[in-house]
Amino acid sequence: SAASDVYKRQNNYEALHPTGPKSNYAYHTEAMDRAMEGGIDDVGIGVLFGLNTYRYDFIGLLMHVEHLEAKFGVGPHTISVPRICSADDINAGDFPNSISDEIFSKIVAVIRIAVPYTGMIISTRESQESRKKVLELGISQISGGSRTSVGGYAETELPDHNSAQFDVSDTRTLDEVVNWLLELGYIPSFCTACYREGRTGDRFMSLVKSGQIANCCGPNALMTLKEYLEDYASEDTRQKGLELILKETDRIPNPKIREIAIRNLKAIAAGQRDFRF
């Protein structure tokens, strides 16, 4: 995936990237075209809101979506919606185009309506409260326990050696985030089945636009959640997750798929792994 920092070329992009490999606006903006022409059929796009007026970049983002669908028949698999946030030596208030929580929520909601098939990503730079709000509006992918500095996962980061790209507002562990999602009634999914089954590009688009992908997503979410609960979760998270799985399994509409999912969930409890539709 790749994000275009800003779609406005003159007096904006070129001012932010005057030199270096990223200074070529056309080459950077057309990265997705080159990727898809080279055989990569799933791409992700995004724009860093706050560097320019949000209306301009929002329209640029949707035009980018429209272009990819028109040219390749496949829109972006994911859309990221980062916004200017504070980091080392950076104050978000110094950017006159930084956006409020209300505008941010509106952007998320309209993208979800305009591009219903895409996965929408929000990072840990957003607070817990902000993440909760946009989950209700269309965000489908979030992270937990993230580090934003070079080598951040290798060792504990010292206070006087901070190289973070941005401050992490949501500092909860993965287990805490999963527990929170379960309390909110969501199904935390660790599924990567579409990639592993080759359901990418035009195959994915046909499935998702017809709604048939629902026959895979729900059961796969429950099975991958079950694996997480068995292998990594705290006891409290595990109990909440098992209750949700029991409830959601009964809601699988296709009887045959429900039967297979129940069988696979029992196999996971017995120690087997890696089931998928």
Model-based region annotation:
Residues R9-N12, A87, V108-R112, A154-L158, ...:
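A short alpha-helix capping/helix-coil boundary motif
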Residues A26-I90, S100-E129, E136, Q141, ...:
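Conserved C-terminal portion of the radical SAM core fold
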Residues A2-Y7:
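Short, small-residue-biased leader/transition segments that mark boundaries at the very start
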Residues Y25-Y27, F49, F58, F72, ...:
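Phenylalanine-focused residue identity feature
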Residues Y13-Y25, A92-S100, D160-D167:
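Glycine-rich tight-turn/loop motif centered on a GG-T
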Residues E129-S140, S146-F277:
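Radical SAM enzyme core and accessory elements
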Residues N12-Y13, Y54-Y56, Y153-A154, T200-G201:
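Short Asp/Glu-rich motifs
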